[in-house]
Structures are given as structure tokens and as C-alpha cells.
Amino acid sequence: MGIWNYQLLNVFAESPLGGNPLCVVEQAEGLSDAQMQALALQFNLSETVFLLSSEQANAHMRIFTPGAEMAFAGHPSIGSAAAVSRLQGDLQRLTLACRAGLVPLDQQDGIWYFSPPKAAEITPVSVPAAEMAAALGLQEEDLAAAPVWVNTGSDQVLVALKSTDALQRAWLDAAKLACWPRSSVGRRTVFLFVPDEAEITARYFFERPNGGTGEDPATGSACANLGAWLQHFRPADSDRQWKVWQGAQAGRPSCLYLQVAPQGQIRVGGKVVFFASGSFTL
């Protein structure tokens, strides 16, 4: 039997009980893949990170949802950076490794920023837009553009909407999921946003492993994909910064700081609140 320590953090949090909760297991050597997956289900957060030693980076992240391992995810990267900094001597700049590649991070004015691990890929979605709108409880007229796949480390469907009213009405209907495309890791998700606002409002829905759908309060990888969407479809909006608000309807108000540069660089940032720590024995 062994003892492992963990930290509970709220990522993209502007208040102590806001943001997206994250569990970071420190020095996770000795845990099997099956144990990591079972522990992610035990903690039952949107993601749980297991930190391992790395020769290429300050630490290697294994990122698990309750149902699957992820190649990359944004709020685990931000939260892990804060946790690793705390463990390794208050670092202001570090690199984390994950299955998708290396993720550089730095802290500025209390905000941790990451750059996504790969160049953006944008491809069409094969499902008709009207069918996808119906699965969201919307009309095709509510869409501001055709849904697309965007991948800067985690492939997701992005759907731009015309109004905040449509955004507030939207919900991924579990009864209509059969039409929804799956990502490279078999997940059904969607990131909805209204692109015309000075401060972007967004929502992220996902299929739960055991049925039904849920809403994520803050999704850093999707925010990075949003940056790629803006670069591709709104090049005039390059070299800008946005606050992206997410999570209000989920009861966890969250703020993501998005920076988009005309030469292609994307940075996503957020504040991290340390909430609790503990240990478990296996």
C-alpha cells in the first residue's frame, strides 16, 4: 500500500468558490492506468491530473475525466502549473508535458497562461447544421456560422451563435445525441459562443459517461480553440485580448483570459484558487 497527496484547486476562478474544480495528485508514480481512471471517477470532477516526473519538462501530466484519458486539456494545465510552482519553489515560468506535446506556461499578475501544444487544425463537421442546431434546442437561424471541428490540442466542435439569448436557451439534448459527432477520444462535446461581443460569453456541453449531458464551468482547451477560430474566421480580430465568461448557468462563474496574435500565437490564462489538500491510501 502507498500514500499519495493531492491538491484541490479552482481554476479560472475570480472568487474562492468559482471556476472549474480540479484535483492534482502529486508524485503519482506507482499508480496504474486503471487506478488513475478509477480515482478520476472517485473524485468525479471534470478532470483529475496525475503528476509524474519528466526529463523534458517540470512535470508530466496524465489527464483523466471520469470516463477517459485526455491528450490535453486547458484547466488541468493551468491548475497543474500552479500546483507544480507551489511544489518546486514558486516558479513563474515552467513547462508541462502531456500526451499532445509540451505546454509552456507563465504567470503574469496572478494569472497563469498557457500556449496550446499544437498548431490549429480546422475542419468541417459532417453533420448538417440544422440537425446539430436541433440537438441544441435551437433553430439553424440561431447559428452565426457553420459548426466546425477545431483542434489546438483537444479536438472539439465549435458553434458560433448570433445572440446571448440563443446561448442561454441552448442545451445538448441527450435524446438527440445519436447525430452528434465524436472526437478523436470518443467524446461528444460542443463549445458554444457569441463572437460579436467585446467580452465573449460561452458555454461547453458534454455527454456524461453513464448517460445524459452536463455543462463544464470553464474549458481552457476550448478557449484555445476559440482563439484559433477567431484567427481563421475573423482575422481582423487578431492581435486582441478578450475576457471569456463561462459557467454562470452551471453555478460556477469563470473568467478565461484569451490573447490572439496575428502571427498565430494563442494564449489562454486564468487565476487559480487553492481550495484544499489531502491524501489517500491504496
Regions from the PLM with identified roles:
Residues 186, 198-210:
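Catalytic strand-loop segment that frames the active site of acyl-thioester-processing enzymes
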Residues 16, 41, 71-72, 150, ...:
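Short conserved micro-motifs on helix faces and helix-strand junctions that flank
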Residues 70-74, 212-226:
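Short glycine/threonine-rich catalytic loop with a Thr-x-Gly-x-Asp
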Residues 58, 64-181, 197, 231-282:
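Acidic, low-complexity central loop/insert segments
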Residues 43-47, 175-187:
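A common structural junction motif
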Residues 24-27, 51-52, 158-162, 193-195, ...:
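Short beta-strand-to-turn element immediately C-terminal to the catalytic PLP-Schiff-base lysine
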Residues 35-70, 194-201:
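Anion-binding (especially nucleotide phosphate/pyrophosphate-binding) glycine-rich loop
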Residues 1-18, 138:
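N-terminal, positively charged, Ser/Thr/Ala/Gly-biased leader segments
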